[in-house]
Amino acid sequence: CVMARRYRAVLGMTGDNLLHSDYNRGMMLRDGRIFRSQTQVSLMALTEDFSMRIYNAKDAAMLNEIEEGTQDTFAFGPPLILNGVICDKVDEDRVGRINPRAGLGLVEPGHFVAIVADGRLPHYSHGMMLSDFAKLFLDEGCVMAYNLDGGASATMVFMGEYINKRASNHYRSVPDQLLWGYSEQVPTEDDPYRLQGLVPQDWRKGDS
């Protein structure tokens, strides 16, 4: 939320996982600048014409150079939807079990769908399997969709305030976010938070 307020973003959500093991890190570009070129995992690329490309792990590993026009890449994964179809065996991925989720889908160039699903809150929301999460994007008309960093990192911020319920009442440092828009009406970093994404402690206990 701090990052969204710092840049006065209208909407912000969790992006890539920059703290994972070297093996699971992928190619990373930000604003067209390459910070890491090697990749062994799937890749989502956002382009300057407001479109999206998704490469599976095999194709991403064969990339000698990123395609012209790519502005940003994300490598958490896995891909959820390709060519309008939910990817096979998506629930078998390393993060396939029920969890809080964050993801981005594309309907057409310039038309994106951002979704965060709460979880790990037994009396509120358990989370989602990846296949069920993918179906949300399909229902919104997405022809492509990609899974981003979820779990305790899953966060969505609108006008500087949390709009989802976080899996932990402890603030996790999120090193990367996707941000959209700009508004002077967004509070500054020093302003108090009206919505903090917190839930009552008993929502986290037991099963329901």
Where are these regions (language model features)?
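Gly/Ser/Thr/Pro-rich low-complexity, intrinsically disordered segments
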Residues: 1-208
